[in-house]
């Protein structure tokens, strides 16, 4: 009996000692990211430079909307001497959208820095961020002249509706580029960029989904209608089927044909859609033709892929 009592005391002390002095295994950690040029396959460079066009668009739109100034103030070296955007202005944001867009803005600065450091860059293309350009886009989506013209800088909701048209193009572009990359460093960079772009798109879509039934003043259309019309327009311009969906969809387009909610846009298997550079240019040029600049890029995009279409 005494033996059992002593044994119990010994086990208790051993357990207590283990709790006080836990024994950890040696952790295995991923190396810190350096995003240098090691592991960059030469064949990847053009493909990974192309999205710099979209990152410039996002950075300038978000910086101006949140802060009232752009890269020329925040990180002028990243613009590489390219012309400043025209028509951009500080948006009339509420505290929630101000915080969201400010974070997005600084994230895009980091994206540009990582891309330029890893695969090189090019001068910022001329960007049209004017209210009239967004008004033209929304009118094309609805098929008639809105009175007054849509102004993305009017308030937080209008700005988030305009933002609905921005990160998603980068997202589907990165998904499309992914299978073609060879270098481990460019693959790592793309994965990291895609993760944040997807997160931005999800935040925007969730914000709009929560307000799906709200009528967008001063128009008679709801938030859900705006997202559906913008997505339909982008599908028409890209001319490659349905790869873009609003926050409310017919049940046959919902997840497993079971939902009408569509917080995340995805295909039949709930996998992200993908687009080619040509599709993306047809959309962001607002012309339906990758060889005819317009829309956000009056003079076209920069980099070998975008310029090749203009020859």
Swiss-Prot record:
This is Ferritin-like catalase Nec2. Glycans are attached at residues 128, 257, 289. Its EC number is 1.11.1.6. One of its GO terms (biological process) is hydrogen peroxide catabolic process. Observed in all flowers organs; mainly expressed in nectaries and, to a lower extent, in petals and ovules, as well as in stigmas and calyx at low levels. One of its GO terms (molecular function) is catalase activity. The keyword Oxidoreductase applies. The gene is NEC2. Forms homomultimers. Keywords: Glycoprotein, Oxidoreductase, Signal. Residues 1-25 form the signal peptide. It comes from Nesocodon mauritianus (Blue Mauritius bellflower). Involved in the production of blood-red nectar containing the alkaloid nesocodin and that serves as a visual attractant for pollinator visitation, including vertebrates such as Phelsuma geckos. The nectar is initially acidic and pale yellow, but slowly becomes alkaline before turning into red within 24 hours. Together with NEC1 and NEC3, facilitates the condensation of sinapaldehyde ((E)-3,5-dimethoxy-4-hydroxycinnamaldehyde) and proline to form nesocodin, a pigment with a stable imine bond.
């Amino acid at each position: 009996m005494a033996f059992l009592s002593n044994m119990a005391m010994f086990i208790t002390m051993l357990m207590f000692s283990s709790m006080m002095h836990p024994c950890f295994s040696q952790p295995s950690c991923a190396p810190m990211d350096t995003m240098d040029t090691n592991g960059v396959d030469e064949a990847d460079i053009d493909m990974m430079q192309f999205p710099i066009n979209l990152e410039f668009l996002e950075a300038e739109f978000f910086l101006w909307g949140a802060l009232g100034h752009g890269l020329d103030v925040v990180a002028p070296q990243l613009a590489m001497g390219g012309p400043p955007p025209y028509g951009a202005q500080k948006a009339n944001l509420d505290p929630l959208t101000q915080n969201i867009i400010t974070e997005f803005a600084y994230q895009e600065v980091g994206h540009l820095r990582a891309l330029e450091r890893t695969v090189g860059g090019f001068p910022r293309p001329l960007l049209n961020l004017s209210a009239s350009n967004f008004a033209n886009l929304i009118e094309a989506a609805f098929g008639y002249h809105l009175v007054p013209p849509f102004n993305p800088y009017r308030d937080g909701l209008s700005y988030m509706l305009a933002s609905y048209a921005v990160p998603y193009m980068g997202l589907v572009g990165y998904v499309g580029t992914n299978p073609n990359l060879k270098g481990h460093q460019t693959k790592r960079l793309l994965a990291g960029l895609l993760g944040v772009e997807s997160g931005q798109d999800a935040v925007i879509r969730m914000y709009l989904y929560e307000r799906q039934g709200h009528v967008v003043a001063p128009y008679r259309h709801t938030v859900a209608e705006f997202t559906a019309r913008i997505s339909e327009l982008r599908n028409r311009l890209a001319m490659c089927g349905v790869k873009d969906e609003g926050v409310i969809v017919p049940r046959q387009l919902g997840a497993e044909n079971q939902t009408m909610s569509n917080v995340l846009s995805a295909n039949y298997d709930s996998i992200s859609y993908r687009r080619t550079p040509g599709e993306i240019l047809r959309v962001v040029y607002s012309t339906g033709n990758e060889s005819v600049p317009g829309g956000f890029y009056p003079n076209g995009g920069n980099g070998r892929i975008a310029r090749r279409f203009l020859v």
